[in-house]
Swiss-Prot record:
Residues 59-71 have a biased composition (Basic residues). The lineage of its organism: Eukaryota, Metazoa, Chordata, Craniata, Vertebrata. Disruption phenotype: Morpholino knockdown of the protein show impaired gastrulation and heart formation. Embryos display reduced migration of anterior lateral plate mesoderm (LPM) cells and cardiac progenitor cells (angioblasts) toward the midline during late gastrulation. Embryos show altered cardiac gene expression. Embryos with CRISPR-induced apelin and apela null mutations show a strong decrease in the angioblast migration to the embryonic midline during late gastrulation. This is Apelin. It is found in: Secreted; Secreted, Extracellular space.
Length: 77
């Protein structure tokens, strides 16, 4: 039982240390410079064929095709 608790505490401490030291949450003085450099990306050009009207109108739904009556089976309607 003590081994389980000990391993749980060790995993918890390690995960807290890793999460505290990692990533964008850490505040540094040059973080604004990094943000400015990161925001200098050129915007992607959209494909003009995609930017136009969509192929189907907004309220359009695909209708279920009526079953053929040529095959023998239960009456569809």
């Amino acid at each position: 039982m003590n081994v389980k608790i000990l391993t749980l505490v060790i995993v918890l401490v390690v995960s807290l240390l890793c999460s505290a030291s990692a990533g964008p949450m850490a505040s540094t003085e040059h973080s604004k410079e990094i943000e400015e450099v990161g925001s200098m990306r050129t915007p992607l050009r959209q494909n003009p064929a995609r930017a136009g009207r969509s192929q189907r109108p907004a309220g359009w739904r695909r209708r279920r095709p009526r079953p053929r009556l040529s095959h023998k089976g239960p009456m569809p309607f």
